[in-house]
Amino acid sequence: MAASAGPEIERLIALLSKLPGLGPRSGRRAALALLKKRDTLLAPLTAALVDAQAKVRTCSVCGSLDTSDPCAICSDAARDNRLLCVVEEVGSLWAMERGGSFKGRYHVLGGLLSALDGVGPEALRVGELLGRAKGGEVSEVILALPATVDGQTTAHYLADRLAPTGVSVTMLARGVPVGGDLDWLDDGTIAQALRARRPA
């Protein structure tokens, strides 16, 4: 890891390096920045992490993260129960919410089908999705999944599984670029893609 760094610093670098988008070099830079600013950055970050670990939970309805269960979105009576938007991860849900265009409910799958990575339907929240679709309130399931091979494979699988429920199954229009991830898109692109969705 870091030459002449103590085990505590090496452990910090190793843990930071495991975060998405950070490798060993970025982890080292982040660790140094945190240690240089202990009072203004490291201490508040430590408190925020402890707070998040103690209070944040997974919503038993949609799979989002919140401090309450059900989450604020699932508890919002103003939401349209007829529309159910399926996303890969919580980050995609947050991206949809930033756009402000969608007023329905969400379902977080917790990943995508991937033969290469050995991820099958049993590893995702597919059963819960089918249960919600069969519940009687949902009339349309919107598949807001990445325009990647795994995303499209998952979308087609879900469309096949949802067909017997009788709900309309749509996908976001191709305002979402191929290979794109919702979390990286601007609000206007997400809003346009949502308006131009089509049958799956």
Swiss-Prot record:
<dbReference type="InterPro" id="IPR015967">
    <property type="entry name" value="Rcmb_RecR_Znf"/>
</dbReference>
<comment type="similarity">
    <text>Belongs to the RecR family.</text>
</comment>
<dbReference type="GO" id="GO:0006281">
    <property type="term" value="P:DNA repair"/>
</dbReference>
<dbReference type="InterPro" id="IPR023627">
    <property type="entry name" value="Rcmb_RecR"/>
</dbReference>
<keyword id="KW-0862">Zinc</keyword>
<keyword id="KW-0227">DNA damage</keyword>
<feature type="domain" description="Toprim">
    <location>
        <begin position="82"/>
        <end position="177"/>
    </location>
</feature>
<comment type="function">
    <text>May play a role in DNA repair. It seems to be involved in an RecBC-independent recombinational process of DNA repair. It may act with RecF and RecO.</text>
</comment>
<dbReference type="Pfam" id="PF13662">
    <property type="entry name" value="Toprim_4"/>
</dbReference>
<dbReference type="InterPro" id="IPR006171">
    <property type="entry name" value="TOPRIM_dom"/>
</dbReference>
<keyword id="KW-0234">DNA repair</keyword>
<dbReference type="Pfam" id="PF21175">
    <property type="entry name" value="RecR_C"/>
</dbReference>
<protein>
    <recommendedName>
        <fullName>Recombination protein RecR</fullName>
    </recommendedName>
</protein>
<dbReference type="Pfam" id="PF02132">
    <property type="entry name" value="RecR_ZnF"/>
</dbReference>
<dbReference type="Pfam" id="PF21176">
    <property type="entry name" value="RecR_HhH"/>
</dbReference>
<dbReference type="GO" id="GO:0008270">
    <property type="term" value="F:zinc ion binding"/>
</dbReference>
<dbReference type="GO" id="GO:0003677">
    <property type="term" value="F:DNA binding"/>
</dbReference>
<keyword id="KW-0863">Zinc-finger</keyword>
<feature type="zinc finger region" description="C4-type">
    <location>
        <begin position="59"/>
        <end position="74"/>
    </location>
</feature>
<dbReference type="InterPro" id="IPR034137">
    <property type="entry name" value="TOPRIM_RecR"/>
</dbReference>
<dbReference type="GO" id="GO:0006310">
    <property type="term" value="P:DNA recombination"/>
</dbReference>
<dbReference type="InterPro" id="IPR000093">
    <property type="entry name" value="DNA_Rcmb_RecR"/>
</dbReference>
<keyword id="KW-0479">Metal-binding</keyword>
<keyword id="KW-0233">DNA recombination</keyword>
